[in-house]
Amino acid sequence: MDRVYKSYCKQAVITFALAFGFALIVNWGVLQLFGQKSADRAEHSLVGIILLMAYIALRAEKKEDQRQAVGVFFLALIPCYFGTVFPDLDITLFAIGGHRNPLFHSSLSFFLLVFLIGREQRFLQTLVAGYGVGLASHLWWDVLDYGDVRWLPGGVIDRLWLGVHGFLCLLAPGSRLLRGSGSGP
């Protein structure tokens, strides 16, 4: 029994190391593609890629799903990156003094996209789910790193706002990713 546990742990560590290495390489490629050099941008996009990998892995239940997961990952990758970027567009629009505007640092843009695509467009659902994962990762990273949302009083409410909205971004269209036409999370 102890040998089986050690073998399982070794396999888990190797899998994690390979996945993390892959995430670093993909992150570097995405940053190069969009000409990004900021350390903050690199952090946000790496966290987004790692969360996207975990999100897809958790949804790939059957062997057929596992084979399809690679395609879903690459299809959702660029929208995921856009999700990691979107909250910081408030800097461009309102300057740094308006950064962490609650409209940009929320799930509002995600649910607007969900509403616009409807429930029947599986391809678009994959893109929007990727965006939602990227947005969720940005919001959750801000909980750990900054957490100061404009116009909300105190650090606890700010972090609660970011955390809840990050969670909401992982709902909706992703419930049917990598699954047949059935429903459920």
Indicate where each model-derived feature is located.
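N-terminal membrane-targeting hydrophobic helices
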Residues: M1-P185
